[in-house]
Amino acid sequence: MRQFCVFLTNPAYSWGDECLRHFGTHPVQVVYDWNAAAHADEAEGEPERRAFTRRELEAFFDYADEEVLRVRGKGRKGWLPALRDATLFKVAHVYGLRRNETRMLDLTDFGRNPEGREFGEYGTLLVRYGKAKKGSSHKRRRVLTVWHWTPGTIEEWISEVRPGMRHSTGPGLWPSERGPRVGVQRLDSRFAAYRDAVGLDPALKLHSLRRSYITHLIEDGHDPLFVQQQVGHDHASTTAIYTCGSSDFRTRSLRRVLDATIEAGLRPGRTS
C-alpha cells in the first residue's frame, strides 16, 4: 500500500493533477512508519542461518549423551543437569520448538493421540508459549509426535531423572539447579559449548534444531501443510524459508520427477 501511494503521488505520472481535475481532490500518502503494522513473521532469510545436516545432528546428540556419562563417571552431581540439557535439546528438535517454547513446557503439556496410540501418553505436545505477534498474547498450538523413539526419551527424564532435581516439585518440565525453570542464558551457553566441542559450524544456533526438524520432515516426504501446522507458521512461505534441503534431497526429488515424466511418456495408449 505504501508503494502504491508513492506511485500515485509521484508528480512524474500526473495522477494528482488528473484526480484534482476529475474529483476536486488529489491522492496523498497514508502509510507511515508510525501507523504501519510491523512484519511479525520470522525474519529467517539470513544466509548464515541453516539447519543441521543429519550427520551433524547425530554428532551433536552423541556428544550430549557422552557428556552425561563423563560427568556421572566422575561422581559429580552435574550429571542431572547434563541429562536435562541433552533431553531438552532432543525435545526441541523432535517437536520443532523455539527456545522459549521449549523452556516453558510443563509436565501436563503431553497428551494422547487417538490416531497414534503407539506413542502412549506422549502422542501430542501442547505448546502454550508460541511466538506472539505484536500486541497479541502467546499463540498456542498442539504438535503431534512423529518419531517412535521420542516417548522413551521423555519418559526416562520425567519418571527416572527429573525427580532427583532440587526444584522438581514445580510444574516445569525442565527445572534448574536454582529455580523452577532453566534459564535462557544457560541453554545458549550449553548449546554453544557442545557445538564447539564437536567442531561444528558456529553459525548453528539452538534455533537450528527447529530448522532441522522442518527440513528433515520435508525430506522424509511429509506434506508441507502438515509441517507448517506442526511448527505454527501462518504462511507456507515462512516454512519454505526454513527448509534447508540437502543436495542429495534435491537430486532425489529431481530424479523422481524425471522418472515420473518418462514413465508417463512411455505409458501404453498415450497419444502425442
Range-by-range predicted roles:
Residues V231-V257:
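Catalytic-site neighborhood detector that most strongly recognizes the C-terminal catalytic loop/helix
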Residues M1-H22, P81, V146:
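Non-catalytic DNA-binding core/recognition domains of DNA-processing enzymes
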Residues V71-G75, D188-Q229, H233:
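Short, basic (Lys/Arg/His-rich) helix/loop patches that form interaction surfaces
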Residues E46, K133-E155, T169-F191:
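C-terminal catalytic core of Y-nucleophile DNA break-rejoin enzymes
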Residues N10-C19, A92-E121, L225:
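Short, charged phosphate-coordinating catalytic segments
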Residues A59-R99:
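Basic, Lys/Arg- and aromatic-enriched nucleic-acid-binding interface segment
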Residues V257-S272:
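C-terminal secondary-structure termini that scaffold catalytic or DNA-interacting sites
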Residues G24-V30, M104-T153:
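Conserved tyrosine-mediated DNA breakage-rejoining catalytic core shared by Y-recombinases
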